[in-house]
């Protein structure tokens, strides 16, 4: 059986409530995308937010559901795919907004992407702390521009597209999944499915 992991991204509304969730499942060995899901959370998306225009309500594969249903369906899909590891850029943000998924093992992509030791695209002249972490300019957009050398790239702030971009960062960093053991956020998955 192919070992898999998922990359998760959330977008929030003006009330700091999750209004959309994007999840991309990838092969743990090749880090290639295998499948994805995109949920718009109702009624939260109706509140509006900074990136409401990027929700793409009529897009292909869009699921509009209440939070409980969306999280249950995503959780069942993750379980069906034997996914136990969730990756996110600034993972504590997404993990804190998805406490229902605290049982999964969370990893922060930024903990590698923002450090000279793990990101060979960070120049010798970049302003870094003694630890090797960039002092600024380590968001998804800046890091993906740096790694891809594509200055035209612009982060969309659409949860499923951003999850795909965060997977691309992992691919460009070129580290195996085990390297992210240093980037564990917290939490352990209990045995069995929490969706039964």
Q: Can you say where each PLM-predicted feature lies in the sequence?
A:
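Substrate-recognition/cap helix-loop segment adjacent to the acidic, metal-dependent catalytic center
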Residues: 92-114
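Short coil/loop linkers at secondary-structure junctions
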Residues: 58, 104, 150-151
């Amino acid at each position: 059986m192919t070992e898999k992991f998922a990359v998760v991204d959330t977008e929030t509304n003006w009330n700091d409530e999750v209004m959309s969730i994007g999840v991309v499942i990838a092969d743990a060995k090749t880090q290639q995308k295998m499948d994805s899901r995109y949920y718009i959370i109702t009624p939260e998306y109706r509140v509006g937010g900074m990136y409401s225009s990027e929700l793409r309500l009529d897009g292909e594969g869009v699921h509009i559901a209440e939070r409980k249903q969306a999280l249950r369906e995503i959780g069942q899909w993750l379980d069906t795919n034997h996914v136990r590891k969730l990756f996110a850029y600034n993972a504590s943000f997404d993990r804190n907004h998805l406490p229902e998924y605290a049982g999964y093992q969370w990893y922060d992509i930024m903990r590698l992407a923002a450090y000279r030791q793990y990101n060979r695209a960070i120049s010798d002249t970049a302003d870094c702390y003694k630890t090797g972490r960039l002092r600024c300019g380590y968001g998804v957009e800046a890091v993906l521009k740096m790694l891809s050398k594509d200055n035209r790239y612009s982060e969309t702030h659409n949860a499923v597209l951003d999850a795909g971009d965060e997977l691309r960062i992992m691919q460009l960093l070129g580290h195996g999944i085990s390297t992210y053991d240093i980037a564990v956020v917290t939490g352990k998955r209990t045995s069995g499915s929490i969706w039964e």
